[in-house]
Amino acid sequence: MSSNKPYVIKGIPVDAGQIIPVRRDIDEWYEDTSRQSRIQLSIFIWALREFQSIDYKDRLSYFQIAGIHHFPLITWDEEEPPVPNKPGYCVHNNVTFPTWHRPYMLLFEQRLFEIMETTIKETVPESHKQEWRDAARQWRLPYWDFAKTSGPHATGPLSLPVLCGLANVVILNPANPETPIELPNPVYKYRAPDLMGNLDKPFHIPPERIDPDKDDYYPWDKCQATTKYGLLKNNPHIQDAGQDVTKSNLALNEHPWYRPNKAGFPPLQTLTYEVHRLLSFKFSSWGAFASTKWCNEENKPPASQQTRDILSLEYIHNNVHNWVGGTDYLGDPSKPDLQGAGHMSSVPVAAFDPIFWLYHNNVDRLTAIWQVLNQDHWFDEPHPSDAKPDDPLKPFHVSKDKYFTSDDARFWRKYGYDYDIVKKPGTNEDRAPEEVKMKINQLYGEPISRLHEGQPVEYDYVINVIYDRYALDGIPYTIVFYLHLKDGSYKCLGGVYTFSTKLSDAQDTERGGCDNCREQKKAGVLASAQIPLTYTLYERQEWHNLGKLLPVKETADIIRQHLCWKVVGVNNSILFDSEQPMRGDPATWRSLDVTAAYSEIHYPVDRNYKYIDRGLPAYHNYLPIHLSPT
């Protein structure tokens, strides 16, 4: 059992004057056959298995550290032993979204390193200890670059890490380092000692309500193991429902939004394009980049010039959670290939799935990239309700008597890790911005290179949406956008997943959302997201017959006349339809505001208008597209 003293998060130590090791791309690391990487993989797998086997009542167990994210809503690393913690620690829809998760990743990384050190001390033979110790000190928790395509010229599909799809994995045996051993893979899933709803109070995991009107719940309490797309209402195999990696990969590439008819079209993956835009935009402030939180005077809809502040890191993050885990517990007949629900799609239990840690490491990496390119933005232009940079990031301790703050978390290198994309080779300093931009283009620039037609000025089209993530009292839902064409078909443009959970009430305190969510609902705080249309319209020219250049008047007319949207519940019901605005309960959706806009794109080009890969596009002066009344 761990000590009751505060657990101080310092990161993996680095000797003075030494180069700080980098967190590596997990697929590149897994495929690296060098001796050091093979040892690192082996000690990582061994340590993660040990971590997951620690008694769930131990503060430093995998179970309790994963539970910080939400369920089981107990205190962690506070003065008293774990007790029910109705306030929770949630920071979603909040400007501290990236900074709160930074020490969270550090905590996980540090715990694994501590277990590695113990394993080397107690298990590895003396003749191999130094080699394994050196490899462990160079190890850092890898990241999953969810927007990096595979194949030549980055044109292949997106996919989960290879390691996440292996039920078993072969490593070097720490007790006999020259001998391979095959073990159940702890990155594949987490398995609790019993059904999570049967664990002793206050550690038990409850079900999660997914329907505001009916008693439909995600049965997390009946799960012993995490799953991806494994839970279906009429499927009795809940305890260990499996990892349908094929569905996760399909969702990452097809983006399985609700489709009101089955007139399909080839999958169009837009995640890579959105990440490139995120890192290209000149946001007005840190908060605009960091969070979906939408606060302005009286929550008015965004003016066109604010369009560049609607896209955010958190919006992209929310959708990927949905695609990796799956939300279709009831089974939507319009998408049979993507039925099923899993832990990653749910705020309360996402962190129990081991892929969560690889995934959020990449969210931290994207934050670091943006920080290097935007060093003049840090909690600037705050709204009065925004968290301050010196507010505590509970429950993480930076010292025995002080919680982390965002200011503490701002500079990542002092915690013993770095990322290659932002690190000047051979130093502990930033790369030059031009070199970072070149790497962004190499990793995520393929869609934008297809869009650039060698013209001095081209155009960008977007949908901006302001929504209330608590409209269903926190129960998650999706807003899906379409072009409803003259032939009656609906062409899907994209969507927004709220990644939220039901707020608690007096009768249901153990299952509900946190204080942050309740306070935001009470204050009327909204959320925002942006659906980029340019790449979709370019790749789907057969929808509009306008050609590749997407002339402004004609393109705006199509958006104005044919854009529509539906709000879809996790139970697959249509909760709001812009073409039938009186359907359902209009009052619930009165704050939902959809606007469209266009702007010029100025590409970084030479005198022959050839794209310069050391620059990023500039998006200028958005103007409104006035939508036709429904």
Curated annotation (Swiss-Prot):
Keywords: Copper, Melanin biosynthesis, Metal-binding, Monooxygenase, Oxidoreductase, Thioether bond. There is a cross-link at residues 90-92 (2'-(S-cysteinyl)-histidine (Cys-His)). This is Tyrosinase. Belongs to the tyrosinase family. It comes from Aspergillus fumigatus (strain ATCC MYA-4609 / CBS 101355 / FGSC A1100 / Af293). Its EC number is 1.14.18.1. It comes from the Eukaryota. GO terms for molecular function: metal ion binding; tyrosinase activity. The gene is tyr1. The keyword Oxidoreductase applies. Pfam families: Tyrosinase, Tyrosinase_C. SUPFAM superfamilies: Di-copper centre-containing domain. This is a copper-containing oxidase that functions in the formation of pigments such as melanins and other polyphenolic compounds. Its cofactor is Cu(2+). PROSITE patterns: TYROSINASE_1 (PS00497), TYROSINASE_2 (PS00498). Cu cation A binds at residues 69, 92, 101. Binds 2 copper ions per subunit. GO terms for biological process: melanin biosynthetic process. InterPro entries: Di-copper_centre_dom_sf, Monophenol_mOase_fun, Tyrosinase/Hemocyanin, Tyrosinase_C, Tyrosinase_Cu-bd. PANTHER family: SHKT DOMAIN-CONTAINING PROTEIN, TYROSINASE FAMILY MEMBER. Cu cation B binds at residues 317, 321, 360. It catalyses: 2 L-dopa + O2 = 2 L-dopaquinone + 2 H2O; L-tyrosine + O2 = L-dopaquinone + H2O.
